[in-house]
Amino acid sequence: MPASDAAVVVDLLPEAGLTALAEAGPIDVVAGVHVANQAGHIVDVLDTVASALEEHSASGRTGVLVADGGSQDATPEVVRAWCESGTPAAPRHCLDVIAPKHRGRAIVALLLAGQRLGARAMVLLDADLTGVRKDWLHALLEPVLRQEADYVLPAYSRTVSEGTLTTNLLAPLTRALYGARIQQVMGGCAGLAGAVVGPWLEAGVETGEWQPHGAELWLTTAALASDARLVEVHLGRKVVTPGGPQPDLATILVRTVGPLFALMGRYQTAWLDRTGSAPVPRRGDACDVQADARSAATEQMVRAFDLGLKDLLPVWEQIMPEPTLARLYPLALLAPDEFRLPPPLWARVVSDFAVAYHERRLPRDHLLRALAPLYLGRVAAFIVEARATRLERIPEIFEKIDRAFEAEKEHLVARWR
């Protein structure tokens, strides 16, 4: 293990934890579960994971690692009791991550512990994915164990307006930057080859602006930037039970778009000269788009956009140049059921924000929060368009968004440099 990685292990795990890992001996297939405030669900999730790993015993010794990301309920005690019921043949380790505890440190601790155990294959899982099934673990591990992939991403079936932050910003921008057409940049689970973990950690494990909430984004970006062999696996519907109260939209943007922008700076040599995009091999059924149970109301979204145009204009003027603003002004005249914020304009807005973030024109938290009304405007426009589109043609809307971001990249690169 490189000296830098060893230092991080010491920073993340106490000596007793390192000793326990050393005594565990080599483990070939590791499942790492990061958890926060899931006392009511975590045992079911962990039992599913352990049961799935038992079926991989032919691939070598298996084990489960659990790291807490700062629970405020009884989760640590529940996890500790579960881990103590393990056996030498299928060990369970509860990693006591040194404070400050958060999701990012928990994920990195799991990766480093898996590396120390000599894992050939790992699966990372967010315990918020309470709908996890045994076949999910198999699907994520098999391409790695067969040496067909270095990094395995999930893909899900979803409703039209589900995951709009991913479909309208995170995935299109990632595709344009790194050239891979992936559905999820932070899908809550992933499969990894043990051989790639060390180099990725060595290059980017130091605490950066992607922490504490962008560790999944960092991992996916590291895979894309290193030209790792990628595979997507269709897992069906994504069922999530969040642990604890959920933040407001502006905070969500700070925690997701912020890390994505920060990683653009860290990995700029990997994307500045890259053009075009290509599909990633996908296993399993097609990821169908299902009808929404009820149509989302766009009136409040459009009202938020209009208020942003009125109240945040002095801030936006420091982020977006006049040509972009001039295209936004007329949108205030549109009724909610006729609202339009076309993908090319939206891609230009995101590009302007990325450049302003990179140049530190404003405090970054303040800048990202100013994106919220614009994002709501884009979601409203997406919903209005989707209502007028047959269900089987919804993927064409997603593709139109993706291509708009690809077309915007040349302009982004010119200003970034």
Stretches with model-predicted labels:
Residues 1-51, 410, 417:
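N-proximal low-complexity "stem/linker" segments adjacent to membrane-targeting elements
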Residues 2-3, 257-417:
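Terminal low-complexity segments of carbohydrate-biosynthetic enzymes
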Residues 65, 76-105, 109, 113-116:
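Conserved donor nucleotide-binding strand/loop of the catalytic core
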Residues 68-77, 129:
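A conserved acidic beta->alpha catalytic loop
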Residues 119-130:
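Short beta-strand-to-loop acidic/aromatic patch adjacent to the donor-nucleotide binding site
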Residues 132-155:
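Conserved donor-nucleotide/metal-binding helix-loop-beta segment in metal-dependent transferases, i.e.
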Residues 152-164:
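Short beta-strand-to-loop element that shapes/binds the nucleotide-sugar donor at the catalytic cleft/hinge
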